[in-house]
Each structure stands twice: as structure tokens, then as C-alpha cells.
Amino acid sequence: MKLTVLGAGAWGTALAASWASQHAVTLWGRNARDVDTMRASRVNTHYLPGCPLPSSLALSADFDRALEAAELIVIAVPSSGLRATLAALARRPALPPILWVCKGFEPGTRRLPHQLVAELLPAGAETGVLSGPSFAQEVAHGYPTALTLASADIALAQRLAEALSGNRLRLYAHDDVVGVEIGGALKNVMAIAAGICDGLNFGHNARAALITRGLAEMTRLGVDSGGRFETFMGLSGLGDLILTTTGDLSRNRQVGLRVAKGQPLDRILDELGHVAEGVTTAREVAALAAERGVEMPIARMVCRILFEGLPASEAVDSLLNREIRSEF
């Protein structure tokens, strides 16, 4: 299959490199100079250092040329860039199936990726989302990884899951697009919370409690949004939550660790050099939960720490001193 990955960040590069052993893959990046450097060195030194790119992987900064004869398009740009990418695709005369791998809400609108897809792409477009517990470096190195591929068209999800599995990457088909998207977005907020917890040296008990109650918050908002409960017990929910709240490669967890040490958020993000979707998502989720009356105290406290200057230790005390209630 001929497929094009749009977005040469860490995740787009890792997926393109993994699939290049089985398919004819083109990786598109918007910066021509960076693409030329990658083509010469066969390494994405900025986003994925230490992971050689296979010789079969084509690289391009020409949007139209990269999409020529593509049988599948995978959008791997951040949530903030999804609208522009979809708008560019919508101008094309015909489109193959399209997957997106970004995790989060559109800043300022609180819209999920599938809602932007419905707004911008032609009716009847074949689309889906790929999500789950995955660090780009591990996928690029060929470490075993399992992900969820969800589409409203379960037959499409099954067909693409079969085609894209291999090279120690296993995909499971699902049809709950909303649940998969909500899980992928909210786990980033909980990863920031877990980083704060660890940065304050609160121990393993506190982290376990935070992960468990964080899953409850994810599920509440997900079901309220139309997702299914069982989705949050799967790879794109619990699986992704465990990875990003405990793994040191998690950018969102790193944000939390450094916030807990008192570092300014702007400096953290500048030095990180990569997108940490959970920072933007925290604000959107807190507003969405308040609008709908969905109880999400952890997400709300993360938002207050990041944007309202609430000291992390005070936020923890506030959570622990809430009214005692039934667990379920």
C-alpha cells in the first residue's frame, strides 16, 4: 500500500519508519530545510534522535507531490494544526482513507478531531483515529506496541488494522471514535498531574490513587460525550493512561515534574522543544467539564496550577479535603 504521513514530528516519523518495511511510505514535513537534512542524514535529529530512518522511506516537503497516488493518508500534526491540514486536503479532487493520530481538542473551540473532520472533509469520507499507549522512540526502534484504530465504519477499521499491523506493531479495530479520542486527550492532563505528584515526592500510593481517580474522570467525560465505558478500559484509555503517567519519556509527565519544582510554564515548554498537548487540553477540558456539569476535580486542579498560579501542594490538599463520598 502507498501511504503518506503528514507531519514529521516524533510520532509521524516513528510511524512512517515502522511502516516503511511493509509499505511504500512518504513522510511529509512543512520545513524544506529540515526535510533536506533528514534526507541527507537519514535521522530526524530534532524530534527523533538516535533512530535511523530506513532507506525505503521517502521524504518530501512538497505537499501535493507527497500525496500523489496515496492510498492512505495519516495526519500526524498537533491538534492546533489539524484544521489547516484538513482544509488543505479538502481542496483535493479525491481522497483516500484518512487517519489522524493527534490527541487533544482544538484550542479555543473544544472540538475533537472527528468534529473537525465532519466539518471540513466531504460527506462520506473514509476516516478514523489511531491511538493508544505508545512512545515514538520505542515504535521507531521496533519495540512491541499495541494500538487502537477506531472508525465509525468498523469494516474500514478492521481492514486498516490488518494492513498496518506488523513489525511488532499490533492494531486492534474499534468503532468508538469519540471514546478513543477522549481517552487520548485526557490522559495527557492526568500525566501532568502524575508528574506533579511525583515531583512533590508523594510516593507510590498517591500516584496509584491519582491514576485510578484520573481514569474515573476520563470515563465520566467520555461517556457524557457519547463514548462507551468499555473503551476506557482498553488500550486507548487505561493503557495510554498508565504509560503516560508512569513513563519517563512522557512529555506531559515531564511538564508536571518541573511545575512541581516551581519552574515557570513558559520556560518549561520552551526547553521541552516538543508539543505537550496536555497543557492546552487542561484548559479546554476544565471549561468543557464546567459547561456540562461533569465532575473532574483533578483536571480542574491541573488547570488552576498551570494557568492560575495555584501552588501544587495546595491543589493536592484541596483534592484530599473534598467531601467524602461513595467511590462509584
UniProtKB/Swiss-Prot annotation:
Gene Ontology terms for molecular function: glycerol-3-phosphate dehydrogenase [NAD(P)+] activity; NAD binding
Disulphide-bonded residues: none
Family annotation (InterPro entries): 6-PGluconate_DH-like_C_sf, 6PGD_dom2, G3P_DH_NAD-dep, G3P_DH_NAD-dep_C, G3P_DH_NAD-dep_N, NAD(P)-bd_dom_sf
UniProt keyword list: Cytoplasm, Lipid biosynthesis, Lipid metabolism, NAD, NADP, Nucleotide-binding, Oxidoreductase, Phospholipid biosynthesis, Phospholipid metabolism
Binding-site residues, NADPH: W11, R30, K103, A136, R251, V275, E277
Active site: K187 (proton acceptor)
GO biological process, one term: glycerol-3-phosphate biosynthetic process
Enzyme Commission code(s) on record: 1.1.1.94
Localization (cell): Cytoplasm
A cellular-component GO term for this protein: cytosol
Keyword Lipid metabolism part of the UniProt annotation: yes
Swiss-Prot/TrEMBL catalytic activity: sn-glycerol 3-phosphate + NAD(+) = dihydroxyacetone phosphate + NADH + H(+); sn-glycerol 3-phosphate + NADP(+) = dihydroxyacetone phosphate + NADPH + H(+)
UniProt similarity note: Belongs to the NAD-dependent glycerol-3-phosphate dehydrogenase family.
Alphabetized PANTHER family for the sequence: GLYCEROL-3-PHOSPHATE DEHYDROGENASE, GLYCEROL-3-PHOSPHATE DEHYDROGENASE [NAD(+)] 2, CHLOROPLASTIC
Function according to Swiss-Prot or TrEMBL: Catalyzes the reduction of the glycolytic intermediate dihydroxyacetone phosphate (DHAP) to sn-glycerol 3-phosphate (G3P), the key precursor for phospholipid synthesis.
Record-given protein name: Glycerol-3-phosphate dehydrogenase [NAD(P)+]
Top-level taxonomy: Bacteria, Pseudomonadati, Pseudomonadota, Betaproteobacteria, Nitrosomonadales
Name of the gene: gpsA
